[in-house]
């Protein structure tokens, strides 16, 4: 059990209904009148839902111990995706529902972290940025020089991102996996 006064960003907790939540934001509030409380924004690790919850100061909630395993993505197989444990070389098959949020950035041989709670796979954590190759890009409109003009570009995974006008097919770009935003050309 952990006191809500000790909550930190990234901490995982289990609520009374059995849901597993990760704290995204928290704020200790001590009003001039009345008891202190903690306002939180949390993400459900099973379905991705985000919820704002308020706890009374000093309230206790159960901490969920999430084990993170380093694994390598090998290949898709029908409706499943095959991963290999880097230490034991055991293979793990995940459904498309379990890897849905990672699919736009998932490349073969990519190292990922798989979140496991008591044998239940909760999801995949990607590196914060990935290098992807542009396979198709809308043409840039000549003379359109307004600042920060973007165009659509399709990367090798089939995902469409917004890139600056000067990016052409065949170029490698760095993409933020948390926001899906273009970070820059890859220089490597």
UniProtKB/Swiss-Prot annotation:
Coiled coil: none annotated. The keyword Protease does not apply. The keyword Cytoplasm applies. InterPro entries: Elong-fact-P_C, NA-bd_OB-fold, Rib_uL2_dom2, Transl_elong_fac_P/YeiP, Transl_elong_KOW-like, Transl_elong_P/YeiP_cen, Transl_elong_P/YeiP_CS, Transl_elongation_fac_P. GO terms for biological process: peptide biosynthetic process. NCBIfam families: efp, PRK00529.1. Belongs to the elongation factor P family. This is Elongation factor P.
């Amino acid at each position: 059990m952990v006191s809500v006064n000790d909550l930190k960003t990234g901490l995982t907790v289990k609520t009374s209904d059995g849901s597993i939540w990760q704290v995204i934001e928290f704020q200790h509030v001590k009003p001039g009148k009345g008891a202190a409380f903690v306002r939180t924004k949390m993400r459900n690790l099973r379905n991705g839902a985000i919820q704002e919850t308020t706890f009374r100061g000093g309230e206790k909630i159960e901490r969920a111990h999430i084990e993170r395993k380093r694994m390598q993505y090998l290949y898709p197989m029908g409706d499943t995706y095959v991963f290999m444990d880097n230490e034991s070389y055991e293979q793990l098959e995940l459904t498309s529902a379990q890897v849905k949020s990672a699919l736009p950035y998932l490349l073969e041989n990519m190292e990922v972290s798989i979140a496991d709670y008591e044998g239940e796979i909760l999801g995949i954590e990607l590196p914060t940025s990935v290098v992807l190759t542009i396979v198709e890009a809308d043409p840039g409109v000549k003379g359109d020089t307004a600042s920060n003009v973007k165009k659509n570009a399709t990367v090798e995974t089939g995902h469409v991102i917004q890139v600056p006008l000067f990016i052409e097919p065949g170029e490698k770009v760095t993409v933020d996996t948390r926001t899906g935003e273009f970070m820059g050309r890859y220089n490597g």
